[in-house]
């Protein structure tokens, strides 16, 4: 395979970033920074995990070529949020609403048994239909009302009589509630800033296509695997540039 090309950040004035990482079977993590508006990768990194140091370094590299990071849409990973707040505190953060819905529906299952879980599942499934600030306010009011109604049930605890150890009786309901409450401050940024994407679905789709190609080349050594990914990203990026000319 020819020597891998050197990645260069293409300068532009302002970007609405999608940031996400995906893991492969060989424990390699690919971090991608995508420009939502032109559907192109600005920067990538092959690493072992979504490390705070790497994320901060990459965001600085993007800023250092004169690009203003207007917003970041991500799945809510703690290190991504922290890196954005430390390197570009002026950037708008948007939590991927599809990811929130997916996680909560997975934890609550398709057919929850309790009234509280059924109502929360219905609420969270409505997120995809919210397009305005007014609709977001109504949704949050409904969530607060739901939480007030079921607060005692959500926080109910079970205790081991012997050890005294306790746990939340309705663990997945409590986890889902906490997940939503942590996300709310950055859940509806897109309703106030209309160029901010509300999901990172396009980057997930990109990962899916990459993994489809990799399945056709099973058995690559780690070095050849990384070279394949680098070439794929480079060629996809240049194909995108050509189509926009």
Region spans (language model):
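Short, charged/polar low-complexity linear motifs in solvent-exposed/disordered segments
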Residues: 36, 43, 59-61, 111, ...
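RNase H-like nuclease fold core
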Residues: 1-90, 180, 202
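A short hydrophobic/aromatic micro-motif that marks alpha-helical segments and, especially, helix-coil
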Residues: 35, 50, 114, 217-219
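A generic structural micro-environment signature
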Residues: 25, 52-53, 94, 104-110, ...
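Acidic/histidine-rich catalytic cores and adjacent linkers
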Residues: 71-81, 88, 121-245
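Conserved beta-strand -> loop -> alpha-helix junction used to position metal-binding or nucleic-acid-contacting
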Residues: 72-78, 83-124
